[in-house]
């Protein structure tokens, strides 16, 4: 009986590992957009944190514009994109891990 339970558990773990790999491949394809300055700066990245593009409104590049402000807006847009990617990842992975007895707030390493 114990041997059968262990074999079942191993099979379940292997299936979950395969599902995790598929989910990570899917997350690499999902893009999120972070914004700052009411959309003047946009960062598009995947849920695997690969930045695809950065868009800066031309008005921010005009002569006399504040370089520090532009740098802050880029950082804020990037951080917004990272938060959205994390939220999307948690949402997608949540359905996969819903049957696991994990403590509340436990973060998996993906």
Curated annotation (Swiss-Prot):
Q: Which domain of life is it from?
A: Bacteria
Tell me where it mainly resides: cytoplasm
Q: Which keywords does UniProt give here?
A: Cytoplasm, DNA-binding
The cysteines covalently paired via disulfide bonds are none
The segment annotated Disordered runs over 88-110
A GO molecular function held by the record: DNA binding
Q: Which stretches does UniProt call biased (Polar residues)?
A: 88-98
Q: Which N-terminal stretch is annotated as signal sequence?
A: none
Q: Where is the composition biased (Pro residues)?
A: 101-110
Its annotated compartments are: Cytoplasm, Nucleoid
Show the GO cellular component annotation of the record.
bacterial nucleoid; cytosol
Q: What does this protein do?
A: Binds to DNA and alters its conformation. May be involved in regulation of gene expression, nucleoid organization and DNA protection.
Q: How does it assemble?
A: Homodimer.
The record's family statement is: Belongs to the YbaB/EbfC family.
Cited HAMAP family: DNA_YbaB_EbfC
- The identity of this protein, by name, is Nucleoid-associated protein RALTA_A1934
According to its UniProt entry, this protein's organism is: Cupriavidus taiwanensis (strain DSM 17343 / BCRC 17206 / CCUG 44338 / CIP 107171 / LMG 19424 / R1)
